[in-house]
Amino acid sequence: MSLTNEQIIEAIGQKTVLEVVELIKAMEETFGVTAAVAAAGPAAAAAVVEEQTEFNVVLVEAGDKKVNVIKAVRELTGLGLKEAKEKVDGAPQVVAEGVSKEAAEDAKKKLEEAGAKVELK
């Protein structure tokens, strides 16, 4: 029994991005081809989306509770009082660089609870 194009598209649509990437690699190896576009222009930006694994925690603004934010920065970074205060006063500043998604979300939560505005990049 042969699958129709619609059945194939439906099956691919149910896969995660990671599974589709693995499928593409397997097809490239099996058929000896590449999925790269020959001369892609700016309009043909069909890049495979990969999930980001490393994040930077950026302190955007200290907010009203600056003392609490300084305490949170010290706790997260291990900086001294002076260095943590300089980081908070100089916002926007990177508080944590190249951390996992879970660690970045934890840091963001702690800083926001202290009253800061935070972004993950």
Swiss-Prot record:
Quick one: a GO biological-process term for this protein?
translation
* UniProt GO cellular component terms: cytosolic large ribosomal subunit
Q: Matching InterPro entries, A to Z? A: Ribosomal_bL12, Ribosomal_bL12_C, Ribosomal_bL12_C/ClpS-like, Ribosomal_bL12_oligo, Ribosomal_bL12_oligo_N_sf
Question: Listed GO molecular functions?
Answer: mRNA binding; structural constituent of ribosome
Alphabetically ordered keywords of this record:
Ribonucleoprotein, Ribosomal protein
Complex and partners:
Homodimer. Part of the ribosomal stalk of the 50S ribosomal subunit. Forms a multimeric L10(L12)X complex, where L10 forms an elongated spine to which 2 to 4 L12 dimers bind in a sequential fashion. Binds GTP-bound translation factors.
* Alphabetized HAMAP family for the sequence: Ribosomal_bL12 (MF_00368)
Checking NCBIfam families in the record gives: L12
Q: In which family does this protein belong, per the annotation?
A: Belongs to the bacterial ribosomal protein bL12 family.
Function, as annotated, reads:
Forms part of the ribosomal stalk which helps the ribosome interact with GTP-bound translation factors. Is thus essential for accurate translation.
Protein name per Swiss-Prot or TrEMBL: Large ribosomal subunit protein bL12
In the UniProt record, the gene name given for this protein reads rplL
